[in-house]
């Protein structure tokens, strides 16, 4: 949820975000979500609140979005990301953690609402990620399967309205 404590700052004509996302894998599928109007999928998560640890952010966001108590494990990626979305330019720093969702008993699609935004959650086969639009686009089957230690990733500017 975007509140007064959220680290999302308008600066110099753009918006700086500090974001955390989770990589949940189950039965060779990865959990992704999107809004009904987006043409791309992304990892679930949200913005960090001031004085909040990033692991706690992911726990809070998963509870807010899904009602599920996630277990946050390894930090996989630290990502510097520049993109345009919804008529704004973003500079985003993101922490991406592996997470376990023990309360999910099925891999059925489900919906949630976060800050008046509808979200569709879907378990996508990891081997078929290349068939859908995933953003950030470094998220591939190889990146997920070949995780050995935390990596720093820098992404070039991308306009999400034209992907």
What are these regions, as identified by a protein language model?
Residues 14, 40-41, 79-84:
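Short, solvent-exposed loop/turn segments at secondary-structure junctions
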Residues 21-23, 29-30, 94-98:
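Residues embedded in well-ordered beta-strands
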Residues 26-64:
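Conserved Nudix-box catalytic region and its N-terminal flanking loop in Nudix hydrolases
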Residues 48-71, 81-135:
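Unchanged
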Residues 17, 25, 38, 43, ...:
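Short connector loops at helix/strand junctions that flank enzyme active sites
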């Amino acid at each position: 949820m975007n509140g007064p404590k959220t680290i999302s700052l308008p600066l110099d004509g753009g918006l700086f975000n500090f974001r955390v996302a989770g990589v949940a894998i189950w039965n060779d599928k990865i959990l992704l979500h999107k809004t009904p109007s987006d043409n791309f999928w992304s990892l679930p998560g949200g913005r960090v609140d001031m004085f909040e640890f990033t692991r706690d952010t992911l726990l809070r966001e998963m509870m807010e979005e899904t009602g599920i108590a996630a277990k946050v494990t390894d930090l996989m990626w630290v990502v510097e990301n520049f993109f345009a979305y919804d008529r704004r330019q973003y500079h985003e720093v993101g922490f991406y953690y592996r997470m376990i969702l023990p309360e999910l008993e099925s891999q059925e699609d489900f919906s949630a609402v976060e800050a008046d935004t509808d979200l569709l959650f879907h378990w996508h086969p990891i081997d078929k990620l290349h068939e859908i639009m995933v953003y950030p686009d470094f998220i591939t089957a190889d990146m997920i399967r070949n995780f050995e230690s935390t990596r720093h990733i820098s992404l070039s500017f991308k306009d999400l309205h034209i992907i």
